[in-house]
């Protein structure tokens, strides 16, 4: 199922989008909702602070939200950092990953505290696959260029950063992201996964329709393969920052859905 959130310049339309993202019935989560925890995993080239808008929207509605700071030094290190946070959750959680964070949650999501997965313009390899394989048969948009450093880490090309990563952010915000990049060990993209949590956990996907980090066909194909419920949002790859209400709404929907399923099965 695909939900599309369409933006227009009119204030009334903007208000409508916010209303659609957070219906009146979703002001706070019910006292008896089983899934009340959310764990957020950032992607490459950024850190966890970019989740602030999503964090605040979910906390306002009663969720306990934890943001993982993955080191981006290897898949194993990033998964270990995520598992460390999952171990601290007081109950079932929705695990969310953006971009490279999707690979991380795919591996870490087999943790028993994970009730569901949300992929935010994110990668979702299968067990035995690596991240680089997900690009096969697809063409990466020319705006997204990774500059390899001599020590094996990669940065996004600074001249193309805004166009490739955060085209819908303000010039100032995009410049700050560019200047505060966190490089990723490029070898991480070649590491094969041992687990694919989406094979046993329900999944949702946010697809940014103006994403220049991935080919749109690639995003759609990955979401279809994992059986994700898809929400399309008109945004750049930085959708988690530029459209936090829409992203938070999908996470909220996932938590409510998994909780309702648990109640029905009891």
Residue map of PLM features:
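Conserved HGGG/HGGXW glycine-rich cap/lid loop of the alpha/beta-hydrolase fold
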Residues: 33-75
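Short beta-strand/loop motif that positions the catalytic acidic residue
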Residues: 205-207
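Catalytic active-site module of serine/aspartate enzymes centered on a nucleophile-bearing elbow/loop
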Residues: 231-266
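Flexible "cap/lid" loop of the alpha/beta hydrolase fold
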Residues: 113-158, 185-192, 222, 263
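Conserved alpha/beta-hydrolase catalytic His-Asp/Glu region
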Residues: 152-197
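Active-site loop/oxyanion-hole signature of alpha/beta-hydrolase fold enzymes
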Residues: 60, 64-94, 108-111, 132-136
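Gly/Ala-rich beta-loop-alpha elbow adjacent to hydrolase catalytic centers
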Residues: 96-101, 105
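Conserved loop-alpha-helix segment in the C-terminal half of the alpha/beta-hydrolase fold
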Residues: 209-235, 241, 254
